[in-house]
Amino acid sequence: MTTPNKGNKALKVKREPGENGTSLTDEELVTMSVRELNQHLRGLSKEEIIQLKQRRRTLKNRGYAASCRVKRVTQKEELEKQKAELQQEVEKLASENASMKMELDALRSKYEALQNFARTVARSPVTPVRGPLTSSMGPLVPGKVATTSVITIVKSKTDARS
């Protein structure tokens, strides 16, 4: 005979003396092989066999559900970790992007300053200044300026922005 005890999680399946065993716990019922289960079921009534098999199926499903929950929680934690890492990377890339935009703007304004300076020099001819360096530099040609003066202008404009 079977005696289900619904209040106790470790349900014991009791048998009549003289059968294959005296009792089975939930853990034993779940962990035993089908062959072992069939040996224990010999001599029991059809109703008791159905109850034991149903109980075993229920317990196994409960175990599968528990492992599924653990797996789901683990996957959720892993996904949250990946999400946090990706958010950090997005923030880092956004910061790099902003920095590069600022650098690009600075380079663009330097470029525009150089263009404006080149236009100014091209429109108005430079009159040579007579001094000790004039003869060594050669004749000054309109539209051509020494590189150092261009760099000086660009640097001074950049320093003014800082």
Swiss-Prot record:
Record localization: Nucleus
The entry's keywords: DNA-binding, Isopeptide bond, Nucleus, Repressor, Transcription, Transcription regulation, Ubl conjugation
Protein name as annotated: Transcription factor MafG
Keyword Zinc: no
Posttranslational mods: Sumoylation at Lys-14 is required for active transcriptional repression.
Crosslink site: Glycyl lysine isopeptide (Lys-Gly) (interchain with G-Cter in SUMO): K14
Gene Ontology BP annotations: regulation of epidermal cell differentiation; regulation of transcription by RNA polymerase II
Domain bZIP: 51-114
Gene Ontology cellular-component terms listed: nucleus
Region described as Leucine-zipper: spans on this chain: 79-93
InterPro entries for the chain: bZIP, bZIP_Maf, bZIP_sf, TF_DNA-bd_sf, Transcription_factor_Maf_fam
Main location: nucleus
Function: Since they lack a putative transactivation domain, the small Mafs behave as transcriptional repressors when they dimerize among themselves. However, they seem to serve as transcriptional activators by dimerizing with other (usually larger) basic-zipper proteins and recruiting them to specific DNA-binding sites. Small Maf proteins heterodimerize with Fos and may act as competitive repressors of the NF-E2 transcription factor. Transcription factor, component of erythroid-specific transcription factor NF-E2. May be involved in signal transduction of extracellular H(+).
Residue segments, region Disordered: 1-24
Assembly: Homodimer or heterodimer.
Tree of life domain: Eukaryota
Pfam families assigned: bZIP_Maf
CDD domains linked to this entry: bZIP_Maf_small
Organism: Gallus gallus
Start and end residues of each stretch annotated as Basic motif: 53-76
Family listed: Belongs to the bZIP family. Maf subfamily.
Gene Ontology molecular functions: DNA-binding transcription factor activity, RNA polymerase II-specific; RNA polymerase II cis-regulatory region sequence-specific DNA binding
